[in-house]
């Protein structure tokens, strides 16, 4: 093959086997005619086809500008300025008219009134400290001798803390007596009236056996009074101690039966009383129903 027929910019591509050529689409096997031309972007392709999908002439005539990249923030300092700012400046040496700076240790020792004075060996090791000790500031008071300072530290004692006074505890009388709210207090007259009213209602119930006054009048109050006479009052004559010898001899001579007769009889229990009332009411009911059945 002659050399003239070769394309100067063509690159040799390996030949594909027949089996792969049949399976790969033809547009992939074709090489672009322009070689390494740049592919248009999506924005450029849309700009070229704008007339197909845009109806407004104003939008069709305007051209979309590419998006500008964000501007980077400008540095606050230039490299030279940053180097100048970040580099610590050298201290100016004190001139002949400048006052020498005092050491902070000397000031702290003067303020705290140290007991031990500065030894000459330590002063020779720290010339700046010794110089500061020789020339104290005018505003600082002179340092007292160590003995006075020691005595002062010993004599000055901290003030005793005032003892906390305990809170007065409430007395037993105040703790035992409960405080009633003012709304629950009632006068003695109200209480006595309530008790007397309740006693009257209870007495009326037992006297009339729970019946209405009209029914009690129809049945006869005498029977009710006779039925209520079974209750014996507890307020009987109290047996007082005999003071005479004759009374003692008479009490010793009586028999057991006489002593039982002399005892104050106790009242009928509530259960027995209710049983009698129920039995009496049941008898009245039977007496009413019997004549009606005979008629």
Curated annotation (Swiss-Prot):
Where is there biased composition of kind Pro residues? 138-147, 160-171
Q: Which family does it belong to?
A: Belongs to the FAM110 family.
Q: Name one Pfam family in it.
A: FAM110_C
| Region called Disordered, residue ranges | 117-148, 160-191
Which key words are in the record?
Answer: Cytoplasm, Cytoskeleton
Q: Name the domain of life.
A: Eukaryota
InterPro entries per the record? FAM110, FAM110_C, FAM110_N
Q: What subunit structure does UniProt give?
A: May interact with CSPP1.
Name assigned to this protein: Protein FAM110A
The entry's localization annotation reads: Cytoplasm; Cytoplasm, Cytoskeleton, Microtubule organizing center, Centrosome; Cytoplasm, Cytoskeleton, Spindle pole
A GO term from the CC aspect: centrosome
